[in-house]
Amino acid sequence: MFCCFNFRPKGKAKCFAGDVGSIGVAYILLFLIGSLILATGDITWLIFLLVYGVDGCLTICHRIMLHENLGEAHRKHVYQLMANELKIGHVKVSSFYALLQLAVSVGFIFLCPVLESVCGLSLVAWHWIYLFVALALLSVAYVLF
């Protein structure tokens, strides 16, 4: 979202949204996904936030295990480790996250109906199976990273 304002190959960003802007966008996305959940009665649509949710939740769990103050600043998110410790460029890290979330979402939208028609389970059942498999794979990848 902020890429159109912040990405300037040879200069500084024209606009910096920071946490406040990110939270505003998050509320809009949560409203849209919440509306979809209410319309369908299927909570598995939260998968559209899975990559970012896994990183956020597991980072909090990691910090709790380390007895860190959750109110203090940190650099423990995977994207921060990739950019700061591994020196991978921010554009590459952001692109990786976006493409990973896109792949999870596209798989959810297109693969579940195919599995429903081939294997006979309901679409909602495949949504739950897909959600748990994706959650497990992302969690293992996070822990191994």
Q: What do these predicted regions represent?
A:
Residues M1-F145:
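Alpha-helical transmembrane segments
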